[in-house]
């Protein structure tokens, strides 16, 4: 059975001196309460941040990079296109600080840039790689319903519990 999820790890070099502007753009366009990643649909989890490599003795200061990591419903290419369409403004505001970023307006150039900056993924932290985001959500809803039923059942007689169970199963 094929996994229902795929992962993307993108590491793009920032243009010299633009790390602070990129951080400000992330803060402005990726607010804690409403990430543009959600607008793409099928996003299990995603992260966007500036990475500063450690300094090495006798070497010039390393360049900073932008990390975009996401675990999403498969197929990944469809998610990337949905993200490009749904979050073009925020993507351009943040990724525009990266070297050679072409912008989200031109789909083919955007896809080529993502591919050029993509890293292979060795693992995923998704607990249910065989389930889509909708399936995970439905399972969590069912778990909550069963929990509520079990709690309510503590106060029922055996006859009431049987009747409630039959009614719940039909719903």
Model-derived segments and their meaning:
Residues 60, 84-86:
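Low-complexity, intrinsically disordered
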Residues 1-55, 62-65, 70-78, 106-171:
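Short S/T/G/P-rich N-terminal loop/turn motif that feeds into the first structured element of a domain
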Residues 89-103:
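Conserved short beta-strand edge segments in small beta-sheet-based binding/regulatory domains
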């Amino acid at each position: 059975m094929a996994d229902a999820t795929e992962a993307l790890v993108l590491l793009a070099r920032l243009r010299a001196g633009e790390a602070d502007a990129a951080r400000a753009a992330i803060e402005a366009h990726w607010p804690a309460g409403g990430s543009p990643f959600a607008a793409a649909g099928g996003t299990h989890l995603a992260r966007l941040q500036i990475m500063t490599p450690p300094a090495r003795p006798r070497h010039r200061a390393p360049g900073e990079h932008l990390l975009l990591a996401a675990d999403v419903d498969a197929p990944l290419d469809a998610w990337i296109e949905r993200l490009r369409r749904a979050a073009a403004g925020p993507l351009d505001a943040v990724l525009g600080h990266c070297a050679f970023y072409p912008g989200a307006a031109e789909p083919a150039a955007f896809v080529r840039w993502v591919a050029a900056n993509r890293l292979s993924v060795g693992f995923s932290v998704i607990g249910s790689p065989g389930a889509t985001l909708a399936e995970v959500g439905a399972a969590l809803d069912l778990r909550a319903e069963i929990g509520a039923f079990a709690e309510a059942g503590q106060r029922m007689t055996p006859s009431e519990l049987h009747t409630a169970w039959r009614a719940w199963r039909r719903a």
